[in-house]
Design a protein with these regions (language model features):
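The feature captures the beta-strand-to-loop junction immediately N-terminal to the Walker
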Residues: 43-44
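Conserved ABC transporter NBD signature motif
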Residues: 66-78
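Conserved ABC ATPase signature
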Residues: 153-158, 162
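A short, proline-enriched helix->beta-strand linker immediately N-terminal to the Walker B motif
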Residues: 173-177
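Catalytic Walker B motif of ABC-type/P-loop ATPase nucleotide-binding domains
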Residues: 179-182
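Helical segment within the ABC ATPase nucleotide-binding domain
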Residues: 194-208
Length: 220
């Protein structure tokens, strides 16, 4: 695959972590290409810089970090030098992020399906009725039980594995080109991990979405 074929192209990326007194190299000379439909696994111990690299693939850095060298290109767009407005326009619509803790990512005061509908409504991609219909279809594709009604529950009313799949459905709501999965199964038991991983793999293949899967667990 050439760089021209890639949806995401990272070249010689260098990121430093900064404090008042020190500067530490966190990401050193990393290059990779990712095309639509591919899943790239980032594996390493805690503190190895996996999540930092995942954020950089979206054009973002953690607080206290700085991109000091290299390039990150998404579908021809230079994310390192992109304006905040350009990044905001891409995030949620063409680039999505699935965090480690689904429980912390959902608002406990709102029903799951209402939160699912926010992104397509914000980006003007669908009406509320269409967004809810699509949510139910995604719940079904992700093998959530009772897909017609589970979205009308509050986050605390479903299991951890179900909530993690609901968050994956929410990330897919705008049919993004790229999804970053940042250790989405860490808090789940082994059986539930397998269910979530199978569901993620299937839906990524169905929509030919590029994905970066971050984990510290080699078995995953």
């Amino acid at each position: 695959m050439t760089t021209r074929d890639a949806l995401v192209s990272i070249r010689n990326l260098e990121i430093d972590g900064l404090t008042e007194e020190t500067r530490v190299r966190i990401i050193n000379d990393v290059s990779l290409d990712l095309k639509r439909g591919e899943v790239l696994g980032l594996i390493g111990e805690s503190g190895a810089g996996k999540s930092t690299l995942g954020l950089a693939a979206m054009g973002f850095t953690r607080d206290g970090c700085e991109i000091v060298g290299g390039s990150v290109t998404f579908d021809g767009i230079d994310l390192v030098n992109a304006t905040p407005e350009t990044r905001r326009r891409l995030l949620g619509k063409r680039i999505a992020y699935v965090a480690q803790s689904a429980a912390a990512s959902f608002n406990p005061a709102h029903k799951i399906i209402n939160q699912h509908a926010e992104a397509p409504l914000f980006h003007g991609l669908s009406s509320r009725n269409d967004a809810e219909t699509d949510a139910i279809d995604l719940y079904r594709r992700l093998r959530l039980p009772n897909p017609d009604e589970i979205g009308f529950r509050y986050p605390h009313q479903v299991s951890g594995g179900q909530l993690q799949r609901a968050m994956t459905a929410m990330a897919m709501s705008c049919r993004p080109d790229l999804i970053i999965f940042d250790e989405p199964t860490t808090a789940l038991d082994v059986t539930t991990q397998i269910e979530v991983l199978v569901a993620i793999r299937e839906i990524v293949e169905q929509f030919q979405t590029a994905a970066i899967y971050i984990t510290h667990d080699l078995a995953v």
